[in-house]
Amino acid sequence: MIIIGLTGKIGSGKTTTAKIIKSLGYNVFDCDESAQKILKESKTILKIKKMFDSKIQNLITSNHINTNLLGNYVFSRPTDLEQLESLIHPKIKKKEKFFLFKNSISRKKIAFLDIPLMFRKDNFLRCDYI
C-alpha cells in the first residue's frame, strides 16, 4: 500500500484537498480530527486535568476541555506543550496505525495521512510521497 502525506500551514488547502480525495473514494486519516476526539475521551480529560487544571483557570467545565484556553497556554510554554504532546501523540499514532491496518486488510492501494506537522519529529518517514 502506498502512503501519501498531506501537509501544509494553516489555510494552505489541506482540508479542501482531503475532501476532494475522499470524494474520489480514498480514505484519509485526519490527525487534527483524531486529536479532537482524543481530547473528548474521559481518560484523557482526567490526565489533562491533573497536568494543567491548577495552572489554567476554567480549563475543564462539564467534563469538557476548553481547547482554546489549553492551546493559548501550552503554545506559549514549550515544556507544557511537550507534556501535552507526550500524552496525545502516542494515542494519535495508535489510531493512525489502526487506520493503515484497516486499509491494508481491505486491500486499498493508497492511503492518505493529513498531518499538519509532517516534518516535525520525523512524521514524514512513514510516507512514500508527500
Where are these regions (language model features)?
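Walker A/P-loop
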Residues: 15
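P-loop (Walker A) phosphate-binding loop of NTP-binding proteins
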Residues: 9, 21
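ATP-binding Walker
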Residues: 12
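ATP-dependent NMP and nucleoside kinases share a basic, alpha-helical "lid"
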Residues: 97-105, 109-130
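Post-Walker A helix-loop "phosphate-sensing" segment adjacent to the P-loop in P-loop NTPases
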Residues: 22-31
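Hydrophobic anchor at the beta1->P-loop junction of P-loop NTPases
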Residues: 4-6
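ATP-dependent small-molecule kinase phosphotransfer cores
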Residues: 36-108
